[in-house]
Amino acid sequence: MDQKAIDRVQAHLKRTFGNPHIAVLARPKQKDSAEVELKGEFIGVIYEDEDEPGSYMFEMAILAEDLE
């Protein structure tokens, strides 16, 4: 993802979740995705949607230990 796309997605996530601590960071070796962090902690990955240009998918794992 280029920086313009990262900035747009980051702004959208901050607005949608009402949280200014969300950061979207480029992945140096991956051109089609970016990492998402909350207060410096990795929470998921944003991928460019291959079928829908300009759209993205957010993937977040929730571990059993996180639910305790």
Ranges and model annotations:
Residues 1-68:
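Terminal leader/tail segments of proteins
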